[in-house]
């Protein structure tokens, strides 16, 4: 009985505590966006060779800034796109290197993946920052990675609205627009990796256009994660 309780306690510590942290962080992020009447567009898993430039063009047309959580393995050969993201004033953050689920691999492999993702961004930009705001793949962290990020004071960034672009049954492309308008602010999640299905890429583009149009119409501020959270100030 005591062994079983001990095992359950370890499991709770390993994944339960980070899960609770994630839920609280998500709510605080949503509250901050609503308080500031802000729309924060974030994109995971890029850069894509075609979809990311398309998104950058839309953002440039609207003179809006967004946040890109880059996946290290997708950077090689697309360094010019990473530089373009930075040159246009968007936030560059990390989504790790291999999109590892923090609960399904060893803690040390997950931790190594975080560091490898940062290194890939630095290599593309020719910088030595060594750390960037981090979004856990699938929103999952283990206690080792959580403590490491907290000790190093690395912002851990979640989201409040999922665009649904990776769902098996995609919702209406107005999902982000409608939910963000109803809430009065949001941190949206979409994905800018290249798709085989052009309809999915079109869905992302339409979602971004609609959200930016709504923000302009309602006087909602379009901010980056750094601006929302006052990172680096």
Where are the model-predicted features located?
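N-terminal signal-anchor transmembrane alpha helix of single-pass membrane proteins
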Residues: 2-18
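Catalytic grooves of carbohydrate-active enzymes
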Residues: 180-229
């Amino acid at each position: 009985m005591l062994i079983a309780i001990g095992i359950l306690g370890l499991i709770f510590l390993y994944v339960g505590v980070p899960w609770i942290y994630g839920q609280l962080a998500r709510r605080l992020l949503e509250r901050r966006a609503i308080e500031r009447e802000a729309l924060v567009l974030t994109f995971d898993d890029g850069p894509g060779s075609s979809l990311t430039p398309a998104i950058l063009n839309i953002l440039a047309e609207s003179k809006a800034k967004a946040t890109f959580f880059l996946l290290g393995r997708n950077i090689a050969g697309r360094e010019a796109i990473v530089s373009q993201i930075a040159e246009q004033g968007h936030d560059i953050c990390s989504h790790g290197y291999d999109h590892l689920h923090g609960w399904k691999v060893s803690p040390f492999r997950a931790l190594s993946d975080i560091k490898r993702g940062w290194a890939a961004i630095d290599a593309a930009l020719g910088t030595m920052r060594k750390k960037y705001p981090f979004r856990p793949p699938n929103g999952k962290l283990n206690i080792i990675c959580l403590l490491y990020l907290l000790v190093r004071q690395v912002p851990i960034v979640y989201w409040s609205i999922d665009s649904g672009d990776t769902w098996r049954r995609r919702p209406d492309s107005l999902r982000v627009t409608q939910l963000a308008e109803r809430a009065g602010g949001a941190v949206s999640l979409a994905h800018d990796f290249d798709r085989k299905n052009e309809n999915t890429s079109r869905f992302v583009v339409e979602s971004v256009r609609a959200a930016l149009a709504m923000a302009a119409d309602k006087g909602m501020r379009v901010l980056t994660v750094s601006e929302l959270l006052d990172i680096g100030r």
